[in-house]
């Protein structure tokens, strides 16, 4: 299943659970920040273990996987619509390094950010 289909599939789950909706809205609201699932739990004033377990049961993926997919989706948009250097995109999206951004990007999309940019 390609990257676009996986993100679309996750969106299907959003209407099934109020808590999943809250988590996804929080991720979108803080997309350009460095944060973790435990940060989301703190912001939602919820137990981290419960939050993680519920999200995984409802969506079939971890909160971290979903965060990375949303950030990489935004990364693809930035690669398509801007000339921003990779280091700036990775920093803007809250990745700890350009290398980590590239690793996550390739894992999710199947190509490197440079390959993606040259194809679009």
Residue ranges of model-derived segments:
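Terminal helix-turn-helix DNA-binding modules in bacterial transcription factors
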Residues: 24-25, 29, 34, 57-96, ...
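Residues within well-formed alpha-helices
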Residues: 15, 22, 74, 88-89, ...
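…primarily DNA-binding HTH/wHTH and HhH modules…
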Residues: 103-120
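Short hydrophobic/aromatic patch on the recognition helix
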Residues: 51, 55, 100-101, 105
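Residues within helix-turn-helix
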Residues: 38, 49, 85-88, 98-99, ...
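Short, Lys/Arg-enriched, Trp-marked, Pro/Gly-tolerant hinge/linker segments that flank
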Residues: 1-25, 29, 38-44, 57-65, ...
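Residues within the alpha-helical elements of helix-turn-helix
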Residues: 43, 92-93, 108
